Design a protein with these regions (language model features):
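The conserved acidic donor/metal-binding loop of glycosyltransferases
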Residues: 88, 148-152, 237, 249
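N-proximal low-complexity "stem/linker" segments adjacent to membrane-targeting elements
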Residues: 1-68
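Cell-envelope/extracellular polymer assembly enzymes that use nucleotide-activated donors
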Residues: 48-53, 81-83, 229, 244
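Donor nucleotide-sugar recognition loop
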Residues: 229-247, 256, 263-264
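Long helical/loop segments within the catalytic core of UDP-sugar-dependent glycosyltransferases
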Residues: 100-143, 155-239, 251, 272-316
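Short, acidic, metal-binding catalytic loop of nucleotide-sugar glycosyltransferases
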Residues: 68-79
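Membrane-embedded multi-pass helical conduit in multi-pass membrane proteins
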Residues: 13, 29-31, 42-44, 314-405, ...
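A conserved acidic beta->alpha catalytic loop
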Residues: 76, 86-96, 116-119
Length: 501
């Protein structure tokens, strides 16, 4: 027990590193925020062949929308190929084939591909589309644009991204900024959008302009096919195949470009259970990428020590969640130790202001009413802490296993504030993590009570925030599990499924 205060202090300092990281990225962003990357001149006759890949798995609500969107891209039809990489086991396949046939009749080269076996999940599908599809279905493009099933790219997407490759022979990947079709659907979606805007507006721009390693976000981007091949291709040993490949490409000497002025609209999940599933997948995959790439990063002769340190902080960012759980669990025993005076959280101090500053800057950059949008921050903070337990389990899986099950995030064709999800067979329900979250909320309340009784008043706010956070996430999960079916909502979506976005 004598080591417990030391361990607690070290964990608090470790958490402070992630807060400091936000300040570093904000500083880099502010230095470079006025730098603009203009789109090179476009000579339509010189545009190269492009293959669009859209991996799909049981997405009957949105599959027709994404096919319509990519078929409407402004690009020479004789140099545009669309692969719908369909691993679905439900009605999605029929809908996709019918919509693809509709566009083929209008001269668009769009094909729905079914591989013999669903191996490697998304990474396996992308690799199969590039390397194993044969005949007319084989990928023909020199450049590969990727969109998940819930994306709805704007018609000029390729014209604003592909020309950059023609002027930079070592450019391997272009990532664009995500925007959101259903940002204002609910408080949960507004909170997620605030977090994602912070990543895309400040973090990605800071990493790119600061000469740091940056990530591909899995969709809304374009790759040079030669870069994919020379960097080892898509690999399924991590659940973040996008993060893995983008780091391997940069370690191999390829350059990446981030274009904040080009946006790719997509959907964010309305369910807290879906958000937790998504975050768990990213947590597990990021830790697997850390295990896989930490050695090559440290040995790289291309990177300075500052770049290496920032890369490791980036890959390890989800370790913050088990650290948060450990801080909470250690606090109560510390309070009960004889002759122990107080628990200090001074290591978090000002650095805890890093994330909210980052979010505020992102909203100020994007929206005139940024102050109103920052009202989502309290809920985001509660959710960010409240998912710590489910992400802790995911981090543990990432530390002891390679690969894993790619549990998709269900999407429901929600646009603006319209649409519904309660009648869908894809809706998720609360799981065993909810029970643990309730237990952790009660544990945090007990810690606050003991802190009051022992005179450690500085621990009380910390404990109450944890109690509120775990209680919020558990409560949202239970409320959405018990939400009644609305009736007719899915029929309305299906009838309108062919509408262009």
């Amino acid at each position: 027990m004598l080591l417990l205060p030391i361990v607690h202090a070290l964990i608090v300092l470790w958490l402070a590193v992630y807060g400091l990281n936000s300040f570093v990225l904000v500083f880099i962003y502010l230095r470079h925020r006025r730098t603009v990357t203009p789109t090179p001149p476009i000579d339509r006759s010189a545009l190269p062949p492009v293959t669009i890949q859209a991996p799909v798995y049981n997405e009957l609500h949105v599959v027709e929308r994404v096919i319509d969107a990519v078929a409407a891209l402004d690009y020479p039809l004789d140099r545009l190929q669309i692969q719908i990489l369909d691993d679905s086991t439900d009605e999605t396949t029929r809908l996709a084939r019918a919509r693809a046939a509709f566009h083929r009749e209008r001269g668009v080269d769009v094909t729905v591909l079914k591989r013999p076996k669903r191996e490697g999940f998304k990474a396996g599908a992308l690799d199969w589309g590039l390397s194993q599809a044969s005949g007319e279905c084989a990928a023909k493009g020199e450049y590969i644009a990727m969109f998940d099933a819930d994306f709805c790219p704007r018609p000029d997407f390729l014209l604003r991204t592909v020309p950059h490759f023609l002027h930079h022979p070592r450019l391997g990947m272009v990532q664009t900024r995500w925007s959101y079709l259903n940002a204002d659907y609910s408080p949960i979606t507004r909170a997620q959008v605030l977090a994602l805007d912070g990543h895309f507006v400040v973090e990605q721009l800071g990493r790119h302009r600061g000469g740091l390693l940056m990530s591909f976000n899995g969709a809304g981007g374009v790759w040079r096919r030669r870069c994919i091949d020379e960097s080892g291709g898509w690999q399924a040993d991590t659940l973040c195949e996008d993060l893995d490949l983008s780091y391997r490409a940069q370690l191999a000497g390829w350059q990446c470009l981030y274009l904040p002025s080009v946006d790719a609209p997509a959907e964010v999940p309305p369910q807290i259970a879906a958000f937790k599933r998504q975050q768990s997948r990213w947590a597990q995959g990021s830790v697997q990428a850390l295990r896989k790439l930490a050695g090559p990063i440290l040995r790289s002769q291309r990177l300075g020590w500052g770049q290496k340190a920032m890369a490791l902080v980036h890959l390890s960012s989800y370790l913050a969640h088990p650290l948060m759980v450990l801080v909470l669990l250690a606090s109560l025993p510390l309070l009960l130790l004889p002759n122990f005076d107080s628990i200090s959280f001074s290591g978090l101090g000002l650095v805890s202001l890093g994330p909210p500053l980052l979010y505020a800057i992102s909203q100020q950059r994007l929206h005139p009413d940024w102050g109103r949008r920052m009202r989502a921050f309290p809920l985001l903070a509660m959710i960010g802490i409240g998912i710590a337990w489910s992400n802790t389990r995911a981090v543990w899986r990432g530390l002891i296993h390679w690969g894993g099950t790619f549990a998709r995030t269900p999407k429901f064709r929600l646009e603006g504030r319209g649409g519904g999800w309660t009648d869908s067979g894809y809706r998720l329900r609360a799981d065993v993590n909810t029970i643990v979250e309730v237990a952790l909320a009660l544990y945090a309340l007990a810690t606050a009570f003991v802190a009051y009784r022992t005179g450690n008043y500085g621990v009380i706010p910390f404990s109450l925030v944890y109690a509120l956070a775990f209680g919020t996430v558990a409560g949202l999960g239970l409320a959405q599990t018990l939400a009644p079916r609305r009736g007719g909502a899915r029929r309305a979506v299906r009838q309108d499924a062919a509408k262009e976005c």
